[in-house]
């Protein structure tokens, strides 16, 4: 079966594993998914990420992060730009998520960036997701 929106599938897998407090999960790899996983790690939303090569496309293994009392670090994940309705933002219209408490993941000509990085580089692009 052909997957229509692999980014939404990745976010849904992370959301579901986070809700039942799994320690790790595996996602079929792609370059864009790897960049999104790296951003989530760099911003402190996940504990670790590793890339496992296999005979097909590879696997991204994501290790989820929880607080001291087992509370979730990722409160919410939302796919913004979808295959049926793409959402773009100019460099001066890059959105803020919860007044800076969350991040927007944006695909720009300079790579996949957070909203803060896109503002600093004055780059616009496709708004992939919000994470808070």
Curated annotation (Swiss-Prot):
Entry keywords, A to Z: Ribonucleoprotein, Ribosomal protein, RNA-binding, rRNA-binding
Molecular-function GO terms, alphabetical: rRNA binding; structural constituent of ribosome
BP GO annotations: translation
tRNA-binding listed as a keyword: no
GO cellular component, as recorded: ribonucleoprotein complex; ribosome
UniProt keyword Disulfide bond present: no
Pfam families per record: Ribosomal_S8
Source organism, top-level taxon: Bacteria
Family under the similarity heading: Belongs to the universal ribosomal protein uS8 family.
Subunit and interaction comment: Part of the 30S ribosomal subunit. Contacts proteins S5 and S12.
Function: One of the primary rRNA binding proteins, it binds directly to 16S rRNA central domain where it helps coordinate assembly of the platform of the 30S subunit.
Protein name: Small ribosomal subunit protein uS8
Gene: rpsH
